[in-house]
């Protein structure tokens, strides 16, 4: 299962938010489905990209096209007056199973982690069995484990916690992430190694981080293609090469099955696949 991809456009049908930090080329559902077919991937999770803000229409249209194949992670306002409980229920019926909170690209970073807003969102989605997906640099939060140890929902951290390889695995924030994994509080997406190291494939600087999250809790790991790889300034490898990279980083077949099949079925509420 591909647990991290975005659909963007066509912009004529799904226009981007005026306040955005980049403008992606169209990355349509049809193009993504062609990629899934090429990779022989049957299920996928579509994550709301920041260029759409809280307008989830493009993602929801993709979910509607094949409810058996797709799940979604939405972005909503933290104000309960803006999004009603019925609207949350409608998102659930459409296939949404989590909310994304982008801490990296917020306009004002001086206020620190918006913990009260995150907790309010978590309390609202807890009855639905959803999770919060956090895009944040965990190295900026040395008290990460203490902050989230009693959060009411599971947390999903993208891009190995989005900590650059130069910080090393002993970084306090990354160690906090490992602690949350060990205590069944956090999941980690094994995505975007090219975003957090300076080298090219096979991203050897990221191998210690990969090994650390596997050791912490292999049942809390999921994988994603990160398609269409927005805002990546270095040369991108072929998506099939990223799949092959997982084979080398998780060499045990039962471990790969957990990462690619069993774990995401649990997190995203997919029916278990028959063996």
State the predicted function of each range.
Residues 1, 5-7, 117, 121, ...:
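A generic "structured core" feature
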